Amino acid sequence: MDTNSNSPNETGILFVGHGSRLPYNKEVVQAIADKYSETKPDYNIEVGFMELAEPNIPTAFNKLAATGVKRIIVTPVFLAHGLHTKRDIPTILGLEPSPDVEQYVQGHGHHHHGHHHGHHHGHHHHHDEETEKIEFDGEIIYTEPIGADDAIVKIIAERVNPHL
């Protein structure tokens, strides 16, 4: 039996998108996950959304957990860090939110009932569907967002340069 947590049956991957009332965000995040899945066809890969689209993060996460994986890699499909990637997503996952965001949220009006103690009570744009809790005893690896990567610069150049 393979006990390597890098093996496909031990590791799940969750792509997290923002979500939108319009279909485009969901379609793009799903397409990115599908394209990635073509490179890792043996891995269980799911997509979940912060808000305004289904499945939400707990539903997608718990679907992966139900496959018996020992660890789940959560990757936010966001260009840059923000309150969602630094506070909201970690809180939903039961991880500690990044302490550096609190200075920016004073008076923001989107606090989680004024306290943080390891579980999620809901989010300002979420409705009652966000009551599902994450149930997982394994390892959660939470990656950085996309960032100012050379691959992004190349894509922007492909869009802009023909018009120069």
Question: Where are each of the predicted segments found?
Answer:
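Active-site-proximal alpha-helix that buttresses catalytic centers in soluble enzyme cores
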Residues: 1-164
